[in-house]
Amino acid sequence: MATTFRSQTLSKDDVNYRMHFRMINEQQVEDITIQFFYKPHTISLLTVTVLSLMYFAFTRDDGDPDSNLRVGLILLVSFFLVISVLAFPNGPFTRPHPAIWRIVFGLSVLYFLFLVFIIFLNWDQVKALMFWLDPNLRYAKREADVMEYAVNCHVITWERILSHFDIFAFSHFWGWGMKALLIRSYGLCWTISITWELTELFFMHLLPNFAECWWDQVILDILLCNGGGIWLGMTVCRFLEMRTYHWASIKDIHSTTGKIKRAVLQFTPASWTYVRWLDPKSSLQRVMGVYLFMIIWQLTELNTFFLKHIFVFPACHALSWCRILFIGIITAPTVRQYYAYLTDTQCKRVGTQCWVFGAIAFLEALACIKFGQDLFSKTQILYVILWLVCLAFITFLCLYVMVWYAENYGPRQKSFSECEDSIYSEAGDSVTECKGEFEIDSTTSCSTRKRRDSGDSRTINGMEK
């Protein structure tokens, strides 16, 4: 019986789908100038890995069981990250190097697996693990047990107000500056800021440290710290949007100062994408997607406070601030991938980093619920329902205002192609502005035009060729 082989030809839609998904999940570096840093060195890496493993396995003293366990875990994480560099996708970013973002994705996978492991332990085992990591946690106390909140709110003095400008106020300001760089929308940033204060009110019966004086919550938090950070972040966004990005090869720069400057600029975005979460023609699915984005954002913020309250470690402990920094780093590619999924009709699935981030958020919440059953048994269901309703109302109101403003006062023709990436998209070493209403089909023509135009300029990013 003859066997018939049929050649399967991908349709144009399939090709576009794969191209669009690859742009956010496996961004490629274009116009590579120093081949050594981007060529695979798998054999060399394997050799170094095996030799280092042999060295640590046979030269160290294995008489201390505790030290054996710590060193073993450290090497396990290290070699998993080596595999991450070899096998995991780049994600949407390529600056300063794709390997950095593969390691970030590898760390997020490790944290996800760690949360899965934690969920299947009992409370005594979790506490024993925490005490093994840091014996000083045996003496840690909840902040709610040693501090008072929202006391004497009618007493308003300059001394009391100035006393609130501490390291946490600075972290609020700086944190909102970074959030604005990620979200790039005044409307969404202000909505998240306001709804978070409402979230604190609705969950105050569970977490006493959510209780704040009205002037602390409204003036210091919303207006000064959050508002100042949003303004700073959006100002930086506008500045980066107006720049024209032409990247010169470091080989074409002859001065030592120019080479050093180009090397430093490798740690800056390759381009900056104009972001528009909603427009007058947005579908209901897109609106609901933004609402889901708000819910997950609030859930991630809530996890920060519930984790340190249930597992009893202070805000200044390494477990707290390391998690905050880590979540902040993986949020960057997550938001980029979710934005592409939400706004690009050709992108039919979320990126892998976005998927892992969502799983982490829900696993953290699940761990809090499992090990904080005494706390959550006091939950007022009515408050939670009202919180969801208020969050939905404020979100939809904000979205309506954003669409109305864009329709009446927004730019008519201004838009940029999403063929590059930065904190949102980086397409490589040669970038510029491309006209169009987020039409990724024009990516090829835009990139060709950019490379042709960049060749006519003798000065690139302030460096003479």
Curated annotation (Swiss-Prot):
Segments in the Cytoplasmic topological domain: 1-35, 92-102, 308-309, 377-380
MF term (GO), any: L-serine-phosphatidylethanolamine phosphatidyltransferase activity
Region (Disordered): 446-465
BP term (GO), one: phosphatidylserine biosynthetic process
EC class name: transferase
UniProt topology in membrane: Multi-pass membrane protein
Protein name (Swiss-Prot/TrEMBL): Phosphatidylserine synthase 1
Keyword Oxidoreductase: no
Family: Belongs to the phosphatidyl serine synthase family.
Sequence ranges on the Lumenal membrane side: 57-70, 124-286, 331-355, 402-465
Coiled-coil residues: none
Protein EC: 2.7.8.29
Organism taxonomic ancestry: Eukaryota, Metazoa, Chordata, Craniata, Vertebrata
Pfam families, A to Z: PSS
UniProtKB keywords: Endoplasmic reticulum, Lipid biosynthesis, Lipid metabolism, Membrane, Phospholipid biosynthesis, Phospholipid metabolism, Transferase, Transmembrane, Transmembrane helix
Function: Catalyzes a base-exchange reaction in which the polar head group of phosphatidylethanolamine (PE) or phosphatidylcholine (PC) is replaced by L-serine. Catalyzes mainly the conversion of phosphatidylcholine but also converts, in vitro and to a lesser extent, phosphatidylethanolamine.
Catalytic activity, reaction form: a 1,2-diacyl-sn-glycero-3-phosphoethanolamine + L-serine = a 1,2-diacyl-sn-glycero-3-phospho-L-serine + ethanolamine; a 1,2-diacyl-sn-glycero-3-phosphocholine + L-serine = a 1,2-diacyl-sn-glycero-3-phospho-L-serine + choline
TM annotation in the entry: 36-56, 71-91, 103-123, 287-307, 310-330, 356-376, 381-401
Subcellular location per the Swiss-Prot or TrEMBL entry: Endoplasmic reticulum membrane
Pathway the protein acts in: Phospholipid metabolism; phosphatidylserine biosynthesis
A GO cellular component annotation in the UniProt record: endoplasmic reticulum membrane
